[in-house]
A protein has these predicted regions:
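Surface-exposed charge patches in extracellular/virion surface proteins
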Residues: 1, 24, 60, 196-198
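Metzincin-family zinc-dependent endopeptidase catalytic domain
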Residues: 24-136
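Solvent-exposed loop/turn segments at secondary-structure junctions
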Residues: 17-20, 34, 125-126, 154-155
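A generic structural signal for short, non-catalytic loop/turn and secondary-structure boundary residues
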Residues: 4, 50, 72, 140-143
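Fold-level signature of zinc-dependent metallopeptidase catalytic domains
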Residues: 3-29
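Short, exposed beta-strand/loop patches in secreted or surface proteins that constitute
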Residues: 1-4, 67-68
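Structural recognition of the beta-strand scaffold that forms the well-ordered cores
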Residues: 10-14, 116-118, 146-150
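Metalloprotease/metallohydrolase-associated module, dominated by Zn2+-dependent proteases
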Residues: 100-106, 128-198
Length: 198
């Protein structure tokens, strides 16, 4: 969920961890990973207007018996030791909770990449089959060293990531400015299947 008040853009996301592997320690590690990467982007300039960015992100473990309320702010991720399937939805999926490719979890924390998907971004790599029958991933041209194009823990968040998200948000709020009293649904911009990066 994204909102704009004056020149402040607030990006709000509650990430709820599910499954037997979900722990408070993981929740803290995931949240730190987001803030250490996405949280470094604190301003955004568009059409000569500079906006401040507030990252209102909370990662926690689901409470026992908690219902999965899909309200555009909550995102539910099942913690697994291997992501066996990919779901192209905004608010529900899987996330790896262990290390990968002989590296530790701290080196390969996948949360900032997965958070990019929550924000509506797509992968910037393609899967190819090699001569030995195994698969590898090739980063798309122009996306080297980017959080959406590299292996977990290797890419960085860049302003061009926001260029795929925030212009649409700003247009939304410019269009519906001063209409929230009669159209309260315009108060927030929700990322969904219609406005995700194609």
């Amino acid at each position: 969920r994204i909102s704009i008040q004056g020149n402040t853009i607030t990006i709000t996301s509650n990430i709820v961890l599910t499954g037997s592997m979900a722990t408070e320690q993981l929740a803290q590690a995931y949240q730190k990973n987001i803030m250490d990467n996405w949280g470094k982007l604190t301003t955004y300039k568009y059409n000569d207007v500079v906006y401040d960015i507030v990252w209102d992100v909370n990662v926690r473990v689901a409470e026992e018996g908690e219902s999965l309320v899909h309200d555009g702010t909550n995102n539910f991720l099942e913690v697994t030791n291997y992501v066996s399937k990919i779901k192209f939805t905004t608010n529900q999926g899987e996330i790896r909770g262990v290390g990968w490719a002989s590296k530790s979890f701290d080196e390969t924390n996948p949360m900032s990449h997965e958070f990019g998907h929550i924000l509506g971004l797509k992968d910037k790599y393609k899967k190819i089959k090699m001569e030995n029958g195994k698969y590898d991933y090739i980063t798309l041209k122009g996306w080297q060293n980017n959080i959406m194009g590299e292996y977990s823990g290797e890419g960085k968040v860049e302003y061009k990531n926001l260029d795929y998200i925030l212009p649409n948000v700003i247009h939304h709020f410019n269009l519906f400015e001063n209409l929230t009293d009669i159209a309260p649904w315009t108060e927030y911009y929700f990322i969904n299947g219609n406005n995700r990066e194609k």
